[in-house]
């Protein structure tokens, strides 16, 4: 789908707080489109890159809490995870480059997205998730996405680069009009095929 269609659908999904996945080639505007959709839905944006995470990061750090006059040892969310459990602000969490993430970390993400909790600690009801990934054929280090994680999403959107929309966007962002004119003249040049390019 075109970028404008993608942003419109993503905005509706975020407003409804439904988790979803978007896939597309590198540099096609997946993350930027998700940020745009979040802002259109009047939601705070949190971008996370779980490629740098360990599966145990989501469990938290060991600590102690007082319950009913008793001291209990528990795992307490910290950093990003703590923010998700305490925020009251409508928040869209963009899980970026999820296809590059180790499968064990993807499995840990399933609790957040499906159950809305981290090892028994509830995520705020105001939080929703949007996942983004390149495709395996893009040769962007995508090893695949755990099917159970994909099943936690209500839909998978496939973003394609549209030369006309790209040219219009470049003009609105102040890029040289010659670049936009070139893209309109040679629209196929914006479609990078990693498989064929690396075999030349």
Identify the meaning behind each predicted range:
Residues 1-200:
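C-terminal regulatory/interaction module of P-loop NTP-utilizing enzymes
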């Amino acid at each position: 789908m075109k970028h404008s269609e993608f942003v419109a659908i993503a905005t509706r999904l975020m407003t409804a707080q439904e988790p979803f996945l978007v896939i597309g080639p590198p540099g096609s505007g997946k993350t930027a489109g998700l940020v745009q959709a979040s802002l259109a839905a009047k939601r705070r944006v949190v971008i996370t890159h779980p490629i740098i995470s360990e599966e145990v990061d989501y469990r938290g750090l060991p600590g102690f809490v007082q319950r009913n006059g008793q001291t209990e040892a528990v795992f307490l969310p910290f950093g990003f995870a703590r923010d998700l459990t305490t925020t009251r602000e409508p928040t869209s969490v963009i899980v970026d480059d999820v296809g590059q993430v180790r499968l064990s970390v993807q499995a840990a993400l399933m609790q957040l997205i499906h159950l809305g909790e981290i090892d028994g600690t509830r995520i705020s009801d105001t939080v929703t998730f949007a996942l983004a990934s390149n495709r395996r054929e893009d040769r962007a280090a995508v090893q695949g996405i755990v099917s159970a994680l994909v099943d936690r999403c209500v839909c998978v959107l496939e973003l394609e680069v549209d030369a006309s929309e790209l040219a219009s966007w470049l003009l609105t962002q102040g890029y040289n009009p010659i670049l936009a004119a070139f893209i309109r003249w040679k629209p196929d040049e914006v479609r990078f095929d990693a498989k064929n390019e690396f075999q030349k």
